[in-house]
Regions:
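Tubulin/FtsZ superfamily GTPase core signature
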Residues: 1-157
């Protein structure tokens, strides 16, 4: 389900960027930069037990709901959720599968000739000519949900 309410998206960004021990960080600076350079935002949060075929299919269906026209940047956070203190594993292969789903959606719809993947704080306004995917990996503790979570915020011009 696509979230369009800016207050809900702000809350989601605070959860994404809050006090979580991030492995590769998306922080509030990234979100605020996206928010200030966008006329509007859309977001979604997908919770799943694993990134096997059913989880990836769930992600594909959720991503299809995003319109691509006018999209200029995507914040993507892949989060392991567990009740234990240790980080719930997110394997490199799983991370790549998720990035591929997001990339293919925007590429297939010809929003940009190419997508640029980079880690946060490498953002530069002159550099961002196409749709950028800014991504991060993190972990959070929860007593309710154990598994994995994918958070997506898309900024539109």
């Amino acid at each position: 389900m696509i979230i369009t309410d800016i207050e809900k998206i702000d809350n989601m960004a605070e959860q994404m960027c809050g006090n979580n021990p991030n492995l590769i960080a998306i922080d509030m600076n990234d979100y605020n930069r996206l928010k200030s350079s966008s006329s509007y935002l859309n977001a979604t949060q997908i919770q799943m037990q694993c990134f096997l075929s059913e989880g990836i299919e769930q992600l594909k269906q959720a991503i299809k709901e995003f319109k691509t026209e006018g999209a200029h940047q995507v914040l993507l956070q892949i989060c392991g959720v567990s009740s234990a203190l240790e980080v719930h594993e997110i394997r490199f292969k799983e991370m790549c599968m998720i990035l591929k789903v997001v990339e293919e959606h925007f590429e297939k719809n010809q929003v940009a000739e190419k997508l640029v993947l980079h880690v946060t704080s490498a953002l530069d306004k002159d550099f961002c000519k196409n749709v950028d995917i800014v991504w991060g990996l993190s972990h959070r503790k929860s007593t309710e949900i154990i598994g994995r979570e994918v958070n997506v915020i898309v900024g539109y011009k």
